[in-house]
């Protein structure tokens, strides 16, 4: 997998967390940099660990599915990307409640970690698909963690100003990127380019 594809995956994996961070930032009256950095660190660490867990699970099953690995990567990335696009198109009632609330909130470590795990399930599934590809999972984990740290830190700070405007679009963009990366993996394998 090319370095460019790894960076794309890193940013795609961070878009759910970015959308959640915008929501967290919107819930705060005036988010401080320490709040944003703490959220970025928690989300980034969790998002870096989950693809490694998925990769380990995928490696355990690799010998059984190696003939179909490119299809598995394509289907997993495509399904996750499609799910993210569909989720980005929906506006839930909690979005309106969050936007209407003027009550300042501070988010504790447990709340941030719970949200971080919830937004990193897709990264675990991507890790499973990466187990079937020629990629160094340590590099992917670091890239995903750094991208998530950056995106969440920015998301918290942008949250108050941008709220619902960018949040859903970021999730849709991340989904589109996953669908494209999955399609490129399948194309490279079928065409002999990979």
From Swiss-Prot:
It is a multi-pass membrane protein. Belongs to the MntP (TC 9.B.29) family. GO terms for molecular function: manganese ion transmembrane transporter activity. The chain crosses the membrane at residues 3-23, 37-57, 69-89, 110-132, 147-167, 172-192. HAMAP family: MntP_pump. Pfam families: Mntp (PF02659). Probably functions as a manganese efflux pump. PANTHER family: MANGANESE EFFLUX PUMP MNTP-RELATED. GO terms for cellular component: plasma membrane. Its main location: membrane. It is found in: Cell inner membrane. This is Putative manganese efflux pump MntP. InterPro entries: Mntp/YtaF, Put_MntP. Keywords: Cell inner membrane, Cell membrane, Ion transport, Manganese, Membrane, Transmembrane, Transmembrane helix, Transport.
